[in-house]
């Protein structure tokens, strides 16, 4: 792979297998160019490889950077321009800073300048993280602190977006986003908590306590034998998604607090034992209804079940940027039952999306309906659940797409 990166790069600094004119809003191909730059930079500083301090690799990096700085690729989706690309290239810029020419460094700072303070929830955290990397390139200690304070300002509960009082996570309105934005939130906070540990910018115990409680009272419930529940994946239904997202959460939980918080370590140990330990029975047993997300989890020693609903308060699921284009019915009472954890692994290409488990829908050969905007799509408030911690009941009145039902 690395040989290909080096040998195939054109004189202009472009790779022949990347479509630089790509207009997709998701999976934007030019970002691969940025990812390869970061990969090469990491390799350049890796003593474990023959490419350590390689002049050939360094030359390739400079040429690839020059192409990006010269052509200035722009995606139709703002996320890549302000978050995705600066997040990837920012890491490369910082690692490669000593090798950057003054012209390259100026261009690098310009790329990072695409990120501005603003937004909410995880988008706000991503943007502030990118600004912090720009501040490091500029040796601006005050801006680093401002960015850090902006990041930790989201470690609270009860906002419209972010960590909710029921320990679910919302983004794009009142919409459960455990496996998408919420996972990025935990991953990012874990990273920053380690970076700042032992410094004047370190997270305090209250902040670490909120994040570890999100894992303890939120994420532990939606994972079963190293897989994340299908209904928590959001619109990201890609290959092996339940496995990859569970692993990402496990790594983030393990590193939260830089190994200095007893509470974080305890929560991480429980999560790891439940999902990756050799245990005959699941120790986390009970019934939990995430009342702000219309989402129910029931756990027994040998199995787990989930129910995902929507109401006039809660958005069921989103379809956007080409993702989840068949997910119209995914929150109409979808019910998944797990025993070994692999029951629904990679089933997505084979599913009849009108016959998801627990869903009531009209049978039709017409294309699946697509709704582009994130808004509540079940015209009733009678949706919810009750629980005593061990047992519970969930109920849903369906009134959408011509169907009325009580579930």
What are these model-predicted stretches?
Residues 3-232:
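Aromatic-lined, polymer-binding surfaces characteristic
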Residues 180-184, 191-289, 293-294, 301:
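Extended, regular secondary-structure scaffolds
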Residues 88-95, 234-254, 357-369:
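A short, hydrophobic/aromatic-rich structural module that often spans a beta strand
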Residues 258-407:
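Catalytic and substrate-binding regions of extracellular carbohydrate-active enzymes
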